[in-house]
Amino acid sequence: MKPAPRDIIPYPRFPAAASRDRGLLSVVIPCHDEEQVIDATHARLVAVLPETGMDFEIVYVDDGSRDGTLRRLEAIAAGDSQVVVIELSRNFGQQAAMSAGLAAARGDAIVITDADLQDPPEVIPEMVRRWQEGADVAYGRRRRRAGETRFKLLTASLFHRLFARLMPYPMPVDTGDFKLIDRAVADAVNALPEKRRYLRSLVPWAGFRHEPVWYDREPRAAGATKYSPWKLLKLAADSLVLSSDAPMRLTWVAAGALAAVGCGAALVAATSRQTGLTLAAATAVLALVAAVQTAAVAIVGEYVVRAYREAQGRPSWVVRTTLGRERAKRGSSRAA
């Protein structure tokens, strides 16, 4: 048999829509310092998931919590056979925690959501219905976002639209990580070799049939957000660099604009009789050149750093313990 080309990712064919009425639904929830809300999250999940008509499992991933989150998850798993708890060896970040849960999930369909209840679990049955009707990805699209400042709403909206414009494939806007994906989509994403991941762009990259499920995002049920303005800025930079080469290509645009400015400054210098004005124009152009060069070097440096990290070959996460499955292992690791 002729081997498949190396750039083709093998994964199972997705089932026909008629075969999706039953099966196993996995819900993956990354957790970091969610002690105050995790019991309420679990209660709402177990109340709403039977409405889907599917068997289900809930996969909690403790991402190096420093509070009592892990103890609460252990207590939940002890009383519920449908719960799996994956404890990472340290805090690897939300994207790594979601990827760890996605790799461990066994469902025919997999829902990814956060533990803070801003994305209401009551939307999940509608996502399942869309999947049963033939969608391979049913992603939550936010109609309203309660409890957030106008500044955050504006900056998030602008970033989502800029990000979508820079992607070479269709990218939904006004969305987060709240989505249902088919087993075939999960297999395709899990098979990707890169270790630093941004699932919001990897799932659309995989293709398949996507449908939005509109909902109103709720205020955080308890606790505080784990994303400071600095972390949000870092996430935005990571998402762009990990998902697109557009930032490097934009340096060509900057170079062209700088050339135009330089020509204009040269023209001013040639026609002006005021020495002070000529000196000021030259100084401004030199400062602009230095700024653009520094920015270009910084952008290239970001890509070099990420290439270096990929070349190191380290796993994206390390699992310390797994609770709730007979095949639980200690000290395992997995490269995403």
Which sequence ranges carry the predicted segments?
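Short conserved micro-motifs on helix faces and helix-strand junctions that flank
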Residues: 30, 88-90, 179, 252, ...
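Conserved amphipathic alpha-helical interaction elements at protein-protein interfaces in regulatory
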Residues: 47, 51, 75, 79, ...
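Acceptor/aglycone-binding surface of glycosyltransferases and processive sugar-polymer synthases
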Residues: 86-90, 94-104, 118-199, 218-237
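Generic recognition of well-ordered alpha-helical segments
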Residues: 40-43, 47, 71, 157-160, ...
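Structured catalytic core of nucleotide-sugar glycosyltransferases
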Residues: 2-149
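Hydrophobic helical membrane-anchoring modules
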Residues: 2-21, 198-336
